[in-house]
Amino acid sequence: MRAYLTRRRPLLRWLTALALFFTVYLTVRTSRAAMNWLCGGVIFPVMRRISRLCDFFDGSVGEVLLLTGIWAAVIWVACTVRRLATGPRRGAVLADFMLTAGCIALTVYAGFCLLWGTAYNTDGFQEKSGITAQPVSAEALERVTLYFAEELSAAAGEVPRNADGVCAADRKAILAAAGDAYDGIYEEFSFLRMETGRVKPFGCSRALSVLRFTGFYFPFTGEANVNMDSPVAYLPATVCHEMAHQRGIVSEQECSFLGILAATRCTDPVYRYAGWLEGYVRLSNSLYSIDPERCLAIRDTLPEEVRCDLRADSAYWTQFQGAVSQASESVYDAFLKGNGDANGVRSYGMVTDLLVTYFNT
């Protein structure tokens, strides 16, 4: 055993360094002032620069890293299984595998904690803007839902549609227009003005749909990745949501709010339509839970074009319902709660509190 530990001393030293890192991280991350300084002054500026460097590649550098890691892990596991089945010193082989795998997993997790986990205890959009989500009344929720339905109806005729009446906007054009998507809210929220890398299309978008993801922020490259397979009517709102993460906003509730608000203020009609559509869906779901009759009455005012998009979205996501999507949601819920978001995946739906607080004025 002593000889084995001597040979593996570099890995053991690395594990010791990781233990020290996590000790410091768990101790310091509770300090809001320290995290604001670290993230605002060091981590986010560096990651925005890295994300701009990643613009040399039209695709997602993060996706390349993820796929490379997955395939490397598969090959490594296969080789280890072969050595365990046919080679000598199986105990040492298994111990090497477990020790190395532990080092790799903890190193990746340490990187994630440093680049993104620290941000969960920084000032968010609500602290910086002074707009704080408040408990909303049924009457206020109904008013704002009706307002979104009216704006959505007015915007429905401004987007291209296919023969079935479903939104058929060009996905590449949507990504190309993303650079100007936040221009309409910079005057009101100047702290959001900053240079970031381009929003990236995720090549394996079908896999994202299986996991019920429309997009994600990859903290190791600072890239905003979006699902290019899900219904295009909602894509601009997703783009704006992920761009909020690039601006250092961690809360899913706040990013959903900013995604909707930025899209509705955009000069691009496809973005405006997506913003009103996403906001209406969130609001109507909340209204339905407390007053189904009134929710359906508002829905009946929508033009057929909007209903086509609602049906298309429902049909698309229905095909992915199953054990994989449920497991993915459970894991993501645990992840959010583990990083201090007590509402977990429910935080996406809680955007209605911010929407009503902001628009009911």
Task: Give the residues covered by each predicted segment.
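Transmembrane alpha-helices and immediately adjacent membrane-cytoplasm interface residues
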Residues: 72-79, 92-126
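Active-site recognition of the HExxH zinc-binding catalytic motif
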Residues: 58, 235-261
